[in-house]
Amino acid sequence: MTITVEPSVTTGPIAGSAKAYREIEAPGSGATLQVPFRRVHLSTGDHFDLYDTSGPYTDTDTVIDLTAGLPHRPGVVRDRGTQLQRARAGEITAEMAFIAAREDMSAELVRDEVARGRAVIPANHHHPESEPMIIGKAFAVKVNANIGNSAVTSSIAEEVDKMVWATRWGADTIMDLSTGKNIHETREWILRNSPVPVGTVPIYQALEKVKGDPTELTWEIYRDTVIEQCEQGVDYMTVHAGVLLRYVPLTAKRVTGIVSRGGSIMAAWCLAHHRESFLYTNFEELCDIFARYDVTFSLGDGLRPGSIADANDAAQFAELRTLGELTKIAKAHGAQVMIEGPGHIPMHKIVENVRLEEELCEEAPFYTLGPLATDIAPAYDHITSAIGAAIIAQAGTAMLCYVTPKEHLGLPDRKDVKDGVIAYKIAAHAADLAKGHPRAQERDDALSTARFEFRWNDQFALSLDPDTAREFHDETLPAEPAKTAHFCSMCGPKFCSMRITQDVREYAAEHGLETEADIEAVLAAGMAEKSREFAEHGNRVYLPITQ
């Protein structure tokens, strides 16, 4: 079926910045690769380059044609194995060189982390529109944004718009979780226009092919669906192969049972047929298919906890042990692997999840949904989960799957997508700071300096969301002169601590009080003066009162 759509997407640079590129040479082919950055031009005359995920949509020199799709990047190789296999062979691929420039890391570090299985480069040979990126704990923490239609609402145009909107605000990957009509067509439009890797959960489309009845699923239907998606260019796929028949009873006394859609589908199939999941029994064949296209496994946590009460229970960790076994099998076949994690976990139980995943899964990159640190805030779960996300990322999680304010309530719209992405970029960056990631603090320092110097426009431009920062400032001080004023509406001109601090510093400079030695010298001189004055008055402690 042909779908005619004319999606309308946001283009143009983010406020206060422009698209910039760093040119590098692709190893082997010699092709020129353009590595993108968001360049913030500061009022001081300097500039600050930021990691950028927005693709050509923020480049004023690019004409966007959604029907034609994005241009293909050079250096794509289809017949020399996976990134894992090539890294093990000592090769630095074009994708690794691109990532090294993007992350400001050495290409050898990129290759070594991929070779060890501690990082993955989701880059299907059939998705040349994407800009290479890496997921691993040695690199900046990444954020995934889920989009996709449902049987109730949304359209292809809306989902393409959400994809562009999410990447504009910093989504490093996109997952198309469509479960409604036209799943193939929706995915095609997204893939051809996505500058970031795209992930899916193939069991959703396979279920559509059997009219929504999990018991009618077969390995053949699932396998053909996977190949269809590989051919389209899907970069990574969630596979719930760790949901085993014997684990299902472990969920019986849970407060919220099995909350993963894929997990519940496979549990229903196992119980109906009373045999092991076809994803588990055919896993090696699946590995060969993934390796053929260099599709990355995202081994799904189908038994993740959906409530604080169920956190870190027997079902969750039983599945994790099986995911560890499957990780070894996948890597033996040359397929890249990352591991999905929870879920709903109270703060004091979060770190245990990372430590166990690293132990059981050979330090494969951990990719977690939050986790939500409490269950009591529907409509604010982008906040409850960002708290858990920051903690788990500091502990070693490599990619965070965002949660929007609509979680548990409905399908997210454009505003929800942005709110979710921004909340998770905050969590990811906070974790990078805590881990001491190279260059992470440079942006904080640049913004803090601009704040102290009352360079309001520079503050806006360096922030995660320049539009909202400016909007909030304009609500009370909209005039242009306010953008250089040495105060804001919070404190006003007389109570601004930073202005007062500047006044103190100016006074100190004028009176030679800039160093500790200066201050000690002045204090000593003052004390000496008072000592002389005391002596001049006869060394008397009490002096007569004068009228």
From Swiss-Prot:
Alphabetized Gene3D superfamilies for the sequence: 6.10.250.620, Radical SAM ThiC family, central domain (3.20.20.540)
GO molecular function, one term: 4 iron, 4 sulfur cluster binding
Annotated [4Fe-4S] cluster binding sites: C488, C491, C496
Reaction(s) the record says it catalyses: 5-amino-1-(5-phospho-beta-D-ribosyl)imidazole + S-adenosyl-L-methionine = 4-amino-2-methyl-5-(phosphooxymethyl)pyrimidine + CO + 5'-deoxyadenosine + formate + L-methionine + 3 H(+)
Keywords in alphabetical order: 4Fe-4S, Iron, Iron-sulfur, Lyase, Metal-binding, S-adenosyl-L-methionine, Thiamine biosynthesis, Zinc
Membrane-traversing stretches: none
Residues given in the record as substrate binding sites: N146, M175, Y204, H240, S260, R261, G262, D301, G302, L303, R304, E340, Y367
Positions of disulphide bridges: none
Cofactor(s) listed in the protein's UniProt record: [4Fe-4S] cluster
GO CC annotation, single: cytosol
InterPro entries from the UniProt entry: ThiC (IPR037509), ThiC-associated_dom (IPR025747), ThiC/Bza_core_dom (IPR038521), ThiC/BzaA/B (IPR002817)
PANTHER family cross-referenced by the UniProt entry: PHOSPHOMETHYLPYRIMIDINE SYNTHASE, CHLOROPLASTIC, THIAMINE BIOSYNTHESIS PROTEIN THIC
Function according to Swiss-Prot or TrEMBL: Catalyzes the synthesis of the hydroxymethylpyrimidine phosphate (HMP-P) moiety of thiamine from aminoimidazole ribotide (AIR) in a radical S-adenosyl-L-methionine (SAM)-dependent reaction.
Family: Belongs to the ThiC family.
Identification of the protein by name: Phosphomethylpyrimidine synthase
Organism: Mycobacterium tuberculosis (strain ATCC 25618 / H37Rv)
